[in-house]
């Protein structure tokens, strides 16, 4: 039996998006620069030669720069840890051979780090696409289960183009042999 047509697995990137790498790096650089300039204003000499702090009075400017620097470093650390732990990353698997749908995501470290939803394929009634345009556009593919429960499948972040979401939803509905709703 050919198992390549019986299993469909879609990888979900989660927090390891390019934008998260960008913002974590910018916040790390900016936060550490603010903190160094604030500390330099307190100590009275430049800790780093290319970040002069001679004209900055510690109270209030230097103190505020230290505060903003610490906030930037805390947010940057949070972003780097979510990237390291791959929070939100995982996969959507539809296995006709076993007759199950598995949705797996990584969470934050702890007791419930591994988040997994498993249900029989026969419980899937339809694939639904939600398109919301405007200031905050949302294009999401849902699996509708018996009992009108809906499980989102698409990743958070940049919305997919209309053609991409149409193609993904149609391929998934064709693979599962269920109806496609919501266009």
UniProtKB/Swiss-Prot annotation:
Listed transmembrane segments: 21-43, 58-80
Pfam families: Ycf4
Record-linked InterPro entries: PSI_Ycf4_assembly
Compartments where found: Plastid, Chloroplast thylakoid membrane
Top-rank lineage group of the source organism: Eukaryota
Keyword entries, A-Z: Chloroplast, Membrane, Photosynthesis, Plastid, Thylakoid, Transmembrane, Transmembrane helix
GO terms classed as biological process: photosynthesis
GO cellular component: chloroplast thylakoid membrane; photosystem I
Membrane topology: Multi-pass membrane protein
Recorded family membership: Belongs to the Ycf4 family.
Purpose of the protein: Seems to be required for the assembly of the photosystem I complex.
Name of the protein: Photosystem I assembly protein Ycf4
Gene: ycf4
């Amino acid at each position: 039996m050919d198992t390549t047509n019986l299993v469909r697995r879609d990888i979900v990137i989660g927090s390891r998006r390019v934008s998260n790498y960008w913002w974590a790096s910018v916040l790390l650089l900016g936060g550490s620069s603010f903190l160094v300039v604030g500390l330099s204003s307190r100590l009275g000499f430049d800790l780093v030669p290319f970040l002069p702090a001679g004209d900055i009075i510690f109270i209030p400017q230097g103190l505020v720069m230290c505060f903003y620097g610490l906030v930037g470093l805390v947010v940057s650390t949070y972003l780097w840890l979510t990237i390291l732990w791959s929070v939100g990353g995982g996969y959507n698997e539809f296995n006709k051979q076993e007759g199950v749908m598995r949705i797996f995501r990584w969470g934050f470290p702890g007791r419930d780090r591994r988040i997994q939803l498993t249900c029989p394929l026969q419980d899937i009634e339809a694939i639904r696409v939600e398109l919301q345009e405007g200031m905050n556009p949302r294009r999401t593919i849902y699996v509708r289960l018996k009992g009108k429960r809906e499980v989102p499948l698409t990743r958070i972040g940049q919305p997919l183009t209309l053609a991409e979401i149409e193609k993904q939803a149609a391929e998934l509905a064709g693979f599962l042999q269920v109806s496609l709703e919501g266009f």
